Structures are given as structure tokens and as C-alpha cells.
Amino acid sequence: MGNVEDVKVGIAASIDGADRAVAGIQAAADQLDQSLALLRVTAVGSFHPAAVAAINQLEQARLRLDEAIQLSRTAVESANMFRSMI
């Protein structure tokens, strides 16, 4: 472990990386929203099990991306708190 300033610089770099990851996850979530909307419109009136499964799976993927975003943001808050305390 380096001096306090080195630690703070490392934490800041980690936070920057996490922020970039959140932006990427958000972009992926937006794309999934578009894909899901298109699939719903395309499959309207169809009760085919494969269409229903595809919609359900995309919804689950979207929820997990939301969870990843929330966890990442919470981690950034914790890292910022740590950085401010040292």
C-alpha cells in the first residue's frame, strides 16, 4: 500500500472505471428495451411458447442489468466515502 495520496488516486481510478461500466450497462439496457419493445410489437397476438419465453428472458436480462447498475452505483458511493475518510 502506498501513501494516502496514492491510495486516493487508485480509488478515484476505480470509481472512474465503475462509472464508465455503468454507462456501458445503461447503453446495453437501453438496447434491450428497444429489442423488447420490438419483439412485443412483432409477437402481438401470438401466444407461441417460444415468443413468450423470449420476452420473459429479455425482461429478466433487463432486470439484472438494473441490478448491476444499482450495485455499481452503491459501490461508487462506498468508495467515495472511503476516499473521503482517509
Residue ranges and their predicted role:
Residues 1-86:
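Amphipathic alpha-helical hairpins/coiled-coils and adjacent low-complexity
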